[in-house]
Amino acid sequence: MPKYRSATTTHGRNMAGARALWRATGMTDADFGKPIIAVVNSFTQFVPGHVHLRDLGKLVAEQIEAAGGVAKEFNTIAVDDGIAMGHGGMLYSLPSRELIADSVEYMVNAHCADAMVCISNCDKITPGMLMASLRLNIPVIFVSGGPMEAGKTKLSDQIIKLDLVDAMIQGADPKVSDSQSDQVERSACPTCGSCSGMFTANSMNCLTEALGLSQPGNGSLLATHADRKQLFLNAGKRIVELTKRYYEQNDESALPRNIASKAAFENAMTLDIAMGGSTNTVLHLLAAAQEAEIDFTMSDIDKLSRKVPQLCKVAPSTQKYHMEDVHRAGGVIGILGELDRAGLLNRDVKNVLGLTLPQTLEQYDVMLTQDDSVKNMFRAGPAGIRTTQAFSQDCRWDSLDDDRANGCIRSLEHAYSKDGGLAVLYGNFAENGCIVKTAGVDDSILKFTGPAKVYESQDDAVDAILGGKVVAGDVVIIRYEGPKGGPGMQEMLYPTSFLKSMGLGKACALITDGRFSGGTSGLSIGHVSPEAASGGSIGLIEDGDLIAIDIPNRGIQLQVSDAELAARREAQEARGDKAWTPKNRERQVSFALRAYASLATSADKGAVRDKSKLGG
């Protein structure tokens, strides 16, 4: 029988000092012996996805205490990728994932907490907490802040839906008037919550459902809706049950590594491909799998991408649907239901509620359930009122979207495409693979060949795009922006958005060893591995070289002879300590970022730290 971790600090005469300090936090004699559960919050006023979380930790804590536990809350940092985008701030985004994971480990292990409720939401916070949870392997439940309502405004006498990406594109489009750009900016992000499309934050919150670590509805129920409160109340109660199951009944099925098994990771990736999730999810699932000591690699993702169809299409791949529409159609469970009926899921998995996949679908799939309260929950919709308050409205759709032929979520027979929304490409400058969000690529450019325009920083590429130096047919190469080379593997949302602003969204490709925002669409290929700074062949591409992209056949090729590439590599190596570094880039890199770069692996490994350099 495992001993409560917290007993280390609450029992024994030699722990009198620790108990004295616990008493100073409000604990009493009656609390010593109860499980201490960390409420891992991420409230900050910097991030709309987290601005409403201040009181939600207290909500969870009250339920923990009522159920017989002791709740202790702390906060992690949270970087807003949208605000950090397009300047030096983006260097810090991906490294913040490791800091979040480490800080959770530090707090939980330093204070010997027994379990956790993770209140996450945005891009690097959910992955960081997920990595920590699987590293620590103590009972955990995730409950996120929820998606933002889609923006809406009237243009040309028509009400249209908007999101953050629309504001970026229109802000750089010289054909858009100042007044229209201002109107879109003011309408794009109307409420608290994670940005309203299938961007990285919402993708990851959906994947925690598929991994079994959060409750049904977690990925899609709006931040503003009153129904979301129940997820927080349930999390506080349920975590005490899970904790007691493990520590008092020796039930290891309550642990995250047993819930988020390899079968669950395969299900999560299957969901990701089917819903056209952010390419960043590949990085984060690979990183989380390593923390769980699961053998889950790019090869596994490639195999899944070749057999899973696209069953859901959401912004930025279409402006017709946002997360509020996914929820109306049944949310994550609705997509999993269609995948299950197609025979594409591992059924022998359980979630934090203790339900198997078939049991979860029977109870929560809107196409199967007989429970009116579940159907009512999935009718929770937007209010269209600007607010930063959680649970501030209770509007409902008149009906569910259960149209699996033409609705937001499709059945296998009516799939958006037989190929899924993400694909892994391989070639002579991406030997370890690269990723493309096929859900956002127009059918006309699934095969594309063009001359390279090479840039060694995102900034130079942006200047070239806006300066008219990139023309239709070009393949924009942005290198030395990988985990080590950036450092920090910047997102390239501004370059891809500005290509659209300049009318080149369907006329150019962009390839990088950096990554993309979940808001990116178009022929945007990222995570090229190995990265340039690690000696990857992307560092050998020269202006004018022809690049051939073949998504249907999963290929990407630099059309230069092996002999020429060998000569270029020899010349690069001859630069000595300057080899595999940008030639004409001035960038101030802090000590903290240099420390990150010194241990960072390429994207095909999840951009995690290279443990071989640490020994032990």
Swiss-Prot record:
Signal peptide: none
One GO CC term, this protein: cytosol
Cofactor remark: Binds 1 [2Fe-2S] cluster per subunit. This cluster acts as a Lewis acid cofactor.
Pathway: Amino-acid biosynthesis; L-isoleucine biosynthesis; L-isoleucine from 2-oxobutanoate: step 3/4; Amino-acid biosynthesis; L-valine biosynthesis; L-valine from pyruvate: step 3/4
GO molecular function: 2 iron, 2 sulfur cluster binding; dihydroxy-acid dehydratase activity; magnesium ion binding
PANTHER family: D-XYLONATE DEHYDRATASE, D-XYLONATE DEHYDRATASE YAGF-RELATED
NCBIfam families (UniProt xref): ilvD, PRK12448.1
Record's protein name: Dihydroxy-acid dehydratase
Species: Escherichia coli O7:K1 (strain IAI39 / ExPEC)
GN (gene name): ilvD
